[in-house]
Design a protein with these regions (language model features):
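Non-catalytic accessory regions flanking glycosidase/transglycosidase catalytic cores in CAZymes
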Residues: 28-240, 245-257, 283-284, 288-321, ...
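Bacterial Sec-dependent N-terminal signal peptides
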Residues: 1-35
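Active-site His/acidic residue clusters
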Residues: 259-275, 325-327
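Active-site cores of enzymes that catalyze phosphoryl transfer or operate on phosphate-rich substrates
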Residues: 251-254, 262, 273-281
């Protein structure tokens, strides 16, 4: 906890539209003389709380062009000697990605880790997504990627596999001695990989699964009590099964939460800007719901207070498109209908989809995590690369989508403590729905002198006039700022115009 000293008015960071530094401002348009007004008041008598930077994490699944043709492309002239796209690595390093969850996702339900290690790898059928998995990107390639990004590796087990297969993977990754440690050494990696965070399955439920979580968690903790264990907790509009806390709670460090607010799985849609903004406060209510369920388990004594945190390890405004899938049996790869369905997935790569809606929604999501940082200690945008992710990768280069810049601003400009604030302003309406025009987060450094404030202006056509106060006093002194905005709500970046939407100094 950090208390504010009396000389707190020296510096200010502002974020307007979509920008951060002294002020980070995220906004739709700045070419309008009309404005809306708001007042942000920092509660100077309350403590500022440290947040976990793992909320700026990412997720990669063996789907589409996230791995192959994304971060990993050995045949490309843009790749290094190990097959990693250097332009992608450089861009992701701008985001200081703190943690990456891998290999899925639904893909993991059919993944057996042993197929992705060693020199004798063979392609296997990816039944879930109806393609052939080459297995050239496996455990060691994932660890290498994490090293290139200085990111914490977070591995998700096959939730349909036997517990022993999970334990074998942990031993292969982390053990000093034993059968699987010896296998790792034979494969050319004498030192343990030191993977500390493991998830027991992806989006599984039911008593049989929960019992597996209990058994796997118990066995993993026996290997190393410092391992952090998570499992499927809540996805979509489901709720956490109370039996999970009762049966497996003592072995858990995280509950996994997943949500995509525009579900494009089967039918693809591109709602307009206002429709997207009407969704921008839903992450907060979703997070509060999960917190309340955890608190109920704490009150009942099923888990210790503060023991289990939330890993929001799949989230995005938009889900990616996969009509006709996922499946549970091998498909005929030569079937024209199957080929057509798989090709249809590429609509998620269309640059024009990712406009200011994605940038501002992402800022609102991150603000929700920051405001609830006592419980939300990890979040992973899904995916990090291609499909609906912030970085588009094509054979000749990359495009930083609008929400790439949201992440870049937040990770580089925010300070390390979150303050409690009050926001007074008007509402933005769309039919019967409404949200606040302004969303904001205020952060402060360890000294208590330097502030960084992110301000999101959701209004599609009006500028924002915003007062920032510390208690009863207006903040003053030196400040700098960056703004992320565009010519219109539909502004986007593409190959020909990669900087239509990019932060600007103000």
């Amino acid at each position: 906890m950090k208390r504010y000293p009396k000389y707190y008015l020296n510096f200010l960071t502002i974020i307007v539209g979509v920008s951060l530094t002294s002020y980070l401002f995220l906004s739709c348009t700045t070419k309008n003389n009309s404005s809306v007004k708001a007042t942000i008041t920092i509660n100077k008598d309350e403590n500022a709380e440290a947040y976990n930077p793992m909320i700026f994490g990412g997720f990669l699944e063996h789907f589409g062009k996230q791995i192959y043709g994304g971060v990993f492309d050995p045949g490309s002239t843009l790749s290094n000697e190990k097959g990693f796209r250097t332009d992608v690595i450089d861009a992701l390093n701008e985001l200081k990605v703190p943690i990456i969850r891998w290999p899925g996702g639904c893909f993991v339900d059919g993944y057996h880790w042993i197929n992705g290690v060693g020199d004798s790898r063979k392609p296997t059928d990816d039944v879930r997504w109806g393609v052939i998995e080459p297995n050239t990107f496996g455990t060691h390639e994932f660890i290498e990627l994490c090293k290139l990004l200085d990111a914490e590796p977070y591995i998700c087990h096959n939730g349909l596999a036997e517990v022993q297969e999970m334990i074998d993977w942990v031993e292969y990754s982390n053990a000093e001695i034993g059968k699987f440690a010896d296998m790792r050494k034979v494969n050319g990696f004498p030192e343990p990989l030191n993977v500390k965070i493991w998830s027991v399955g992806n989006e599984r439920s039911g008593k049989e699964y929960i019992n597996k979580v209990r058994d796997a968690g118990m066995e993993m903790k026996k290997i190393d009590s410092s391992l952090l264990v998570t499992c499927s907790g809540i996805h979509g509009n489901s709720s956490i099964d109370p039996y999970l806390f009762e049966a497996a709670g003592e072995y858990l460090d995280y509950i996994s939460a997943h949500q995509y607010w525009i579900e494009n799985w089967q039918e693809h849609s591109t709602p307009d800007y206002l429709s997207c903004m009407m969704l921008s406060e839903k992450p907060e209510s979703y997070i509060k719901n999960v917190i309340n369920q955890i608190k109920t388990a704490e009150t009942k004594g099923q888990i210790d207070k503060g023991q289990i945190k939330i890993a929001f390890d799949e989230w995005n405004l938009r889900s990616w498109h996969h009509p006709g899938f996922q499946r549970f049996e091998k498909v005929d790869y030569n079937d024209p209908e199957i080929i057509k369905l798989i090709e249809a997935r590429d609509i998620s790569l269309e640059p024009s989809i990712y406009n200011l809606s994605d940038a501002l929604f992402s800022a609102s999501f991150l603000n929700s995590c920051l405001r609830n940082s006592e419980y939300v200690t990890m979040a992973n945008i899904a995916p990090l690369v291609n499909q609906t992710g912030p970085l588009y990768v094509h054979p000749d280069g990359i495009v930083k989508r609008t929400h790439f810049h949201t992440f870049e601003m937040y990770v580089n400009d925010l300070e390390e403590y979150v303050s409690n604030i009050d926001i007074k302003g008007s509402k933005l309406t769309d039919g019967k729905d409404s949200v606040s025009v302004v969303d904001a987060i205020a952060t402060v450094d360890k000294s208590g002198k330097k502030w960084a404030i992110s301000i999101v202006n959701r209004h599609p056509s009006k500028n924002l006039t915003c007062k920032v106060k510390m208690g009863d006093d207006l903040l003053n002194g030196k400040f700098k700022g960056r703004i992320l905005t565009g010519e219109s709500t539909e502004s986007y970046n593409d190959i020909d115009y990669p900087n239509r939407v990019a932060p600007k100094e103000v």
